[in-house]
Regions:
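Cytochrome P450 core scaffold surrounding the K-helix E-X-X-R motif
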Residues: 71-77
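N-terminal Rossmann-fold NAD(P) dinucleotide-binding loop
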Residues: 228-229
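NAD(P)H dinucleotide-binding glycine-rich loop of Rossmann-like/cofactor-binding domains
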Residues: 87-98, 114, 134-222
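Short structural boundary motif marking the start of a folded domain
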Residues: 2-8
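A short N-terminal beta-strand-loop micro-motif at the entrance of redox/enzyme domains
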Residues: 15-65, 87, 91-95
Length: 231
């Protein structure tokens, strides 16, 4: 009999606004790339789930920390007309949470740490990318995995980390073990690990898209939330 865990689940009603048409990547009554045009009357429950088993190339992680992102709030928050605020890729019902860190429980067949090319060890501390890119489509091959043609997003259209355990592809995991040199308390490592995803948003804007900054440059940062502070 499968062991159980609890997860924070967001539910919403599929009710496309008048004139809405399914996009090429939308799936009727399942997911859309225009969440605020489709999903209505959101509500949250705490539900019981089977603890998932990792398949080939996947890793089972015990979640230790997970941040609350503005997008989590905007998916759970409705406008006056009942539609959710969040405009992006969404598929409900779904466990929320994507700013996560945790401990490897076990790896599925062939699951490897991309930094070492060795199998993941139980007990290794890791964090995860929020976007589950395929690695084989043209945008992925061109170095733009955030434009993946078969994109899934943790906590948006596939189950996220507001739960006790999560299974993720090995290619989307990053080891936090080097942080042992900076932190004596493992709890601090997990907190730092949960900040990797939001900090990477600021890094992508400043370095990848913005071209970087140099000593003496004058810059303006619009926003004083976690991403703005990271930038």
């Amino acid at each position: 009999m499968a062991q159980k865990m609890r997860g924070v689940t967001l539910h919403a009603t599929w009710a496309p606004k008048p004139g809405f048409k399914l996009g090429a990547k939308d799936i009727d009554h399942v997911q859309t790339y225009l969440g605020s045009q489709v999903w209505k009357d959101p509500y949250i429950t705490i539900d019981e789930y089977d603890i998932p088993e990792p398949g080939p190339g996947q890793v089972l992680i015990k979640v230790k920390a997970c941040g609350i992102c503005g997008s989590d709030v905007h998916m759970a928050q409705a406008k006056d007309d009942g539609y959710i605020f969040y405009p992006g890729l969404t598929g409900f019902a779904c466990i929320l949470g994507h700013e996560l860190s945790g401990v490897v429980v076990k790896g599925g067949p062939g699951a490897k740490d991309k930094a070492t090319n060795k199998p993941f060890k139980g007990g290794e501390m890791v964090c995860a990318e929020e976007m589950l890119w395929c690695g084989s489509c043209k945008p992925c091959a061109d170095g733009w995995p955030n434009h993946c043609e078969r994109l899934d997003e943790i906590g948006f259209n596939v189950n996220g980390a507001f739960c006790e355990y999560i299974v993720l592809p090995d290619r989307c995991l990053w080891s936090l073990e080097p942080l042992r040199r900076q932190y004596k308390d493992e709890r601090d490592i997990f907190l730092a690990g949960s900040l990797v995803e939001p900090c990477s948003v600021g890094y992508n804007a400043v370095i990848e898209r913005g071209g970087g900054i140099r000593p003496g440059d004058n810059v303006v940062i619009c926003g004083t939330g976690p991403v703005g502070l990271a930038a």
